[in-house]
């Protein structure tokens, strides 16, 4: 199975380098010996323009297993990332990342990152992962928006 997953991840890397959405980045991490680790990717997701997320590029780690693409990657923002659909551990709660829901082996890294970007400004109140963000999102949108804007300043675009 490792052969299938590493071949698919190599292909994904090639496709990403050839064509990826503006402002995003996604690259395999580097092992201590300098070789690429195709199973752990460092990614950045820009906030959409004209949203409270604009101005930030949000760091995300994508971790793949040797069962990829049969099983989805695990996607994590930094610990305590403020969003209704992100667990305190940073793990993203999104249906396309759920094997029992909408995951399909045809889903690409690009599709996942675009889906997470969309989730940032369009949280799913039916699938909350954190108490405070969902509470503010539903009951005090002004305070929620203030926290989101403050978070965008914590994650400026890379220079």
From Swiss-Prot:
Subcellular location(s): the record lists: Nucleus
What cellular-component terms does GO give this entry? nucleus
Superkingdom, natural source: Eukaryota
Record's SUPFAM superfamilies?
UBC-like
Gene name in the database record:
ubc9
**All copies of domain UBC core, residue ranges:** 4-157
The GO molecular function terms of this record are: ATP binding; SUMO conjugating enzyme activity
Signal peptide annotation: none
Q: Which organism is it from?
A: Dictyostelium discoideum
Biological process terms from the Gene Ontology for this record are: protein sumoylation
Gene3D superfamilies assigned to the protein according to its UniProt record, in alphabetical order: Ubiquitin Conjugating Enzyme
**Its function?**
Accepts the ubiquitin-like protein sumo from the E1 complex and catalyzes its covalent attachment to other proteins with the help of an E3 ligase.
Q: Which UniProt keywords apply?
A: ATP-binding, Nucleotide-binding, Nucleus, Transferase, Ubl conjugation pathway
Please list the residues that make up the active site.
Answer: 93
Family indicated by similarity? Belongs to the ubiquitin-conjugating enzyme family.
Pathway membership, UniProt: Protein modification; protein sumoylation
**Family matches, as InterPro entries:** Ub_conjugating_enzyme, UBQ-conjugat_E2_core, UBQ-conjugating_AS, UBQ-conjugating_enzyme/RWD
Q: What is its EC number?
A: 2.3.2.-
Q: What is this protein called?
A: Sumo-conjugating enzyme ubc9
